[in-house]
Design a protein with these regions (language model features):
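Short hydrophobic alpha-helical segments that form membrane-spanning helices or hydrophobic packing faces
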Residues: 29-32, 198, 242-245
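Non-catalytic protein-protein interaction segments used by genome-maintenance enzymes to assemble
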Residues: 141-200
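Short acidic (Asp/Glu) and glycine-rich catalytic loops that position anionic groups and cofactors
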Residues: 29-37, 168-170, 220-224
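Metal-dependent nuclease catalytic regions and adjoining charged, substrate-binding loops involved
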Residues: 136, 193, 203-250
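Metal-dependent nuclease catalytic cores that hydrolyze phosphodiester bonds in DNA/RNA
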Residues: 1-154
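Secondary-structure boundary elements
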Residues: 126-130, 160-163, 207-213
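Short amphipathic alpha-helical face segments that pack within enzyme cores
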Residues: 52-55, 199-206
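Hydrophobic/aromatic-lined pockets within catalytic cores
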Residues: 57-65, 168-171, 206-209
Length: 250
């Protein structure tokens, strides 16, 4: 597949599933900032917490730093995985230019990560209970003739003709009280995917043929959304969502 000139201008030779639902103007702005000024959007405590929760889950299934040829490796017990997960989390340095907001979130999230990791483990086990073997995250390429570059994707977990995508929701800050302190609300797991999440899952499905399920995880519990309990994840609706993704990238 030849790369069109406007893509070459921004040194962008592929799309990714994670960005497939972003408005085109936003995507072009990101390309321009990265190519012309070397600027990428910075990490923050919230996505970093989700990355670390998945890392902990991966460790307990022997899927950390997954290699498709090697397959699952020796899993760690929950205590070992939790320690390594928190060590990874603690390596992050909060932003210093947002009046302490990121640092406050970083501190508040930490105590809830072990519970989120445990719920993530339970969600993966439930979602892929019929799988003889679980695959972890590795790079997959998909070509769509109506899109002018290849599409890159990374599935969180797959097996038994299903793929599972971990979606973490972190605690939410409450208003500051009169005494100057603040509490945090732990949300219940979501039960319905957003339109953008369905669009993302439609690309995974079209590429692999594996039916998607979304693992909504919080410190309060988890919910597995799949084609059995979520009409939006049934094949007819996935096809409609996929066509919408294709149209949005043209």
């Amino acid at each position: 597949m030849s790369i069109p000139e406007y893509r070459e201008t921004f040194a962008i030779k592929h799309d990714s599933v994670s960005g497939a639902t972003a408005p085109k103007y936003e995507q072009i702005l990101k390309w321009w900032l990265r190519n012309e000024h070397g600027i990428s959007l910075p990490m923050s405590a919230k996505p970093w917490a989700g990355i670390c929760v998945q890392h902990g889950v991966d460790l307990t299934f022997g899927l950390a730093d997954y290699d498709k040829d090697a397959g699952q490796q020796q899993p760690l017990d929950i205590a070992q995985a939790t320690k390594l997960m928190l060590d990874k989390y603690d390596s992050y340095e909060p932003r210093t230019w947002d009046e302490g907001r990121d640092a406050e979130e970083f501190e508040a999230f930490r105590e809830h990560l072990p519970e989120m990791m445990a719920n993530g483990i339970a969600a993966v086990k439930e979602a892929l209970q019929s799988a003889n073997m679980i695959e972890g995250e590795y790079q997959i390429w998909h070509t769509e003739e109506k899109i002018d570059v290849p599409i890159m994707m990374f599935q969180d977990y797959s097996g038994g003709n299903k793929q599972a995508d971990l979606k973490c929701s972190l605690p939410v800050r409450n208003p500051i009280k009169k005494d100057g302190t603040r509490t945090w609300r732990v949300p219940k797991p979501k039960t319905e995917p957003t339109k953008q999440q369905v669009m993302q899952q439609s690309v995974y499905w079209k590429c692999t043929g594996q039916l998607p399920c979304l693992l909504f995880v919080t410190a309060a519990g988890y919910h597995v959304a799949d084609q059995q309990n979520t009409p939006a994840l049934q094949e007819d609706n996935l096809e409609l969502a996929y066509q919408e993704v294709v149209m949005s990238r043209q």
